[in-house]
A protein has these predicted regions:
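Residue(s) in the substrate-gating loop at a strand-loop-helix junction
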Residues: 133
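Active-site helix of classical SDR
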Residues: 112, 149, 157
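Alpha-helical segment proximal to the catalytic Tyr-Lys
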Residues: 117, 162-166, 225
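Conserved glycine-rich cofactor-binding loop
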Residues: 11-12
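Substrate-binding pocket helix/loop in short-chain dehydrogenase/reductase
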Residues: 88-89, 93-101, 197
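C-terminal helical subdomain
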Residues: 173, 192-227, 234-236
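Short C-terminal tail/terminal secondary-structure segment
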Residues: 228-246
């Protein structure tokens, strides 16, 4: 059985957690990022490290050309690229909105295209998992840009799952609420903001990358063999329930 996994955005907090969980589970991991120095800092000499920009077709083509040249055919993809661009629509610059779409949706589309193309050429089944957000499912103030991008991502997941099911390729996503990672550090840097963030959730608290990574690795594993086209929430009930007001 081929147990090569590809992790994009690997130098980030979630990417590192997913890489660690995959390696623990016995996968050979290929880690990808735009900054080679950050990859080196995160992983030292561990794992095959490839510098590529997955937000462009050229970057994705270069990535999969490198994999092909090295006879590496990943059968699992954990796409951990994204950003959190907050702000009301009328205040957001066009550049910031475009960056949000590129990081959260465009990169996912191009990477999925490269991944599924290589699997189909190899005649191999596989699985991909992407990262959405609770904001795609419930209106949250100042989340217009990221909500639009992640809602598009969820549509991509369902469409691709339908397209590639007959080839044995599964496509899913996870949708966390607030997680404690370097990307969110500024939002919960004070006791006041941390307490406010914690109290939003029916199950109070802030998630961490290791929790989400555990679910992502499960979805990529044989245990998730009957799961495709799904978006799994890990948000303390934020997007689905309302507790009693006491």
């Amino acid at each position: 059985m081929n147990t090569i996994a590809l992790v994009t955005g690997a130098a980030g907090g979630l990417g590192q957690a997913v890489t660690h969980k995959l390696a623990q589970a016995g996968w050979q991991v290929v880690v990808v990022g735009r900054d080679g120095a950050r990859l080196q800092q995160a992983f030292g000499g561990a794992h095959r490290q490839i510098v590529a920009d997955c937000s462009t077709t050229a970057g994705v083509k270069a990535l999969f050309a490198t994999l092909k040249a090295e006879q590496l055919v990943p059968t699992a993809l954990a796409h951990c690229i994204g950003n959190i661009r907050l702000g009301a629509a009328h205040r957001m610059a066009e550049k910031d909105f475009n960056n949000c779409l590129t990081a959260n949706l465009v990169s996912a589309f191009h990477t999925l295209a490269g991944f599924t193309g290589q699997l189909r050429d190899a005649g191999s089944p596989g699985a991909a998992v992407f990262v959405s957000s609770a904001a795609a499912r419930i209106g949250t103030p100042n989340h217009e840009a990221v909500a639009a991008a992640k809602a598009g991502l969820e549509g991509l997941v369902r469409g691709a799952a339908a397209t590639y099911a007959s080839a044995g390729i599964r496509v899913n996503a996870v949708a966390p609420g607030m997680m404690e990672t370097p990307a969110t550090a500024g939002m919960i840097s004070s006791p006041t903001t941390r307490e406010a963030a914690t109290r939003q959730y029916p199950l109070p608290g802030i998630g961490d990358a290791a929790e989400l990574a555990e679910l992502m690795v499960w979805l990529l594993s044989p245990h998730g063999a009957r799961v495709t086209g799904q978006v799994w929430s890990l948000d303390g009930g934020f997007s689905t329930i309302r507790p009693l007001v006491r």
